[in-house]
Amino acid sequence: VTDPVLTIPGRPIEGFCDGGRRRSRRHALKIGGLALGGLSMSRLLAAEATGARSNAASGGLGHKAVIMVYLPGGPSHQDMVDLKMEAPAEIRGSFRPIATSVPGIEICEHLPRLAGMMEKFAIIRSLHGGLDQHCSDLCLSGYPIGPRGRQDGHPSLGASLSRLEGPVDRAVPPFVGLTIKTRHAPYGNPGLPGFLGAAHAPCQPDDEGLASMRLSGVTLDTLGDRRGLVEGIDRFRRWRDASATAGHDAYAAKAFDVLTSSRFVEALDVEREDAATRDRYGRGSADPAFGEDAGPHWMDQFLVARRLVEAGVRCVTLSFGSWDRHHSNFARLPDQLARFDQAITALVGDLHDRGLDKDVSVVAWGEFGRTPRINKDAGRDHWPQASCCLLAGGGMRTGQVIGSTNRLGEVPQDRPVHYQDVFATLYHRLGIDVATTTIPDHAGRPQYLLDHREPIAELI
């Protein structure tokens, strides 16, 4: 039986899934067989109904979740959280450190909000394990692009969570990717499912049908009115009945719940927030930062991420900014750091205000650091030998710096921390023991989630 198409009329939309161009067209929302960015609704419901275990409820959320912020291009560790004021001028640059709310910790002057709530963050200054690869794979899965292709088949954290935990709510996907599409595809990867397959790929709300629901003013009230939708809905119901008779996947008949339940769709609608909350996060634009092929200065993503985890999503990924600063590093970073500073502190502060800081972990990082020496174009080049990471929430021990680099910021000196050590910590805060937990690969063979399976002791 062929899946039907329920078409919802659209209106002009801007800056969501078309790179900022205005357009007006009809979008198709397929019900039943549609893969929401790879995760079919029928599979989502099947996972819930077959008894996917849920995380132990605690705090105000009822499940554990993680928000993963990818900084595409590789942020400059020595211009953000690891300034080297004793180094020569060609190393240290023009930014100056400021004191934070935690005595003894200093960070960049262009991160004043973060400095003011340092007690809610942890900084890793000795991050290593990256390669000279421009891609989000390492930051979303713990694995770089290997000889067998993207992540060597290893699933992202979100995909693994989808497989291990399933959905919290049958109308809410467990894994959502907000990352915008980019010409350089690895920048726009929201987290690949790897050998777990498309059933555990992220739901991407910029898919045309879902974008139409979110941005065209189609609300539950609109659906309740059903004017202009009656024929499509009736067609779906006839297909549902025929499918059941034909022995088609019974779970597809329940997929309509995703449409008629407003919980997920409403979570995507930041306009439901009051103006003060919107201003706290900073709004921003979905257009690529500086017109470059990277992430956006779109602070609304951080607010959407918070709303999604409240709605029942287990993992949300997003990208922010353009950090591949081979030139104009000190001209471009002040504005970008100010926007990032506002968004990340609004998110973490909001989680604390809502009592969700024990349930929701936040990580922000890029694929590598930048060269200690400033180049002739006032930029810094790729430097996989050392990088940095920001962590918050998840009940982690914050208000501390872990590790250090040497005098010039070239390599980890004290307490080297591998990217996968961070993943082991995130899994731990999600209630998953990476030392014993496995997932099946294509051949059904059990595979560990990580090669490095020891959480960072200082954080737990």
Regions found by a protein language model. Give the residues of each.
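Ligand-binding pockets and gating/stacking loops
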Residues: 1-460
